[in-house]
Amino acid sequence: MKRLWLILFLFFSPTLGQNIVTQWNSKALQRLMHEWDVKREKMELHLQASMRRTGIDMWIIMSREFNLDPMLQMFGDYGISGWYGHRNAYIFFDPGNNLPLERTLLGTHQSGRMREFFPTIISYGQEGLKPHLADFIKDRNPKKIAINRSRTVSMADGITVEMLAFLEDAIGPVYSSRFISSQDLIFDYISHRTVAELEIETEASHRTWYILRRAFSNEVVTPGKT
C-alpha cells in the first residue's frame, strides 16, 4: 500500500519525480565513470608489465558490433569499446627499449572517451579494416601475437571463427604463424590488482558478509517457523 501511495505521489508530482530520476541517473553516471577510471588506471599500471612477463609483444582483440569479446570489459566495456563498429581491432603493442605501450584502435564508430583507453585511433572507410591491419602489423613485426583463443579458458576465447579467418587473411601466414593464446597474459593481468580494485573488492566482501550474516540470523530466521 505504501508503494502504491509513493507511485501515485510521484506520478502527480512530476517535478519531484523528475528530480529523483535525475539523481538516480547522476549516481549511475558517476559509478560508470569511476569504473572507467579504475579500468584505465589498471591498464596503464599493469598491462605492459604483464605482456613482458608472459613474453608477448602484441595483443590483438577483434570485435564486431553486437558481438563483443569478453575481455573488452576490462578496457571500458559498454560506452567505450566493443559494441560499435563494423569490424574493430583493439591492439596493444610493446615496442621494448623502455618505450611506453602502444594502445591503438583500428575501426569505426568510436565513442567519446575511447581515446582514454586507445590514444591512437585509425579509422577506415570503404577500403575496410584489412589493409590498415596488414600495414600496422607489418610495420611493427611482432614476434608473438596473442589472440583470444583458448580451449580451456572461456574469457580468453572471445574470437569467433569468422574473425579469426578474417585476421589470418588480413595479415598473412607469416604473422598468423606467430599467434599464441592470450590466456596466460589474461591470468597475469587480472591477478595484479590496483589499490582502487582492492578497495572495491573489500567493500564488496563486507557487503556480502553483512547479507549472509543477516540471512542466517534470528533477525529473519525463526526456529521452527522459517
Q: How does the language model describe each region?
A:
Residues 4-13:
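Sec-dependent N-terminal signal peptides
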Residues 18-226:
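A composition/biophysics-driven feature that prefers long, compositionally simple stretches
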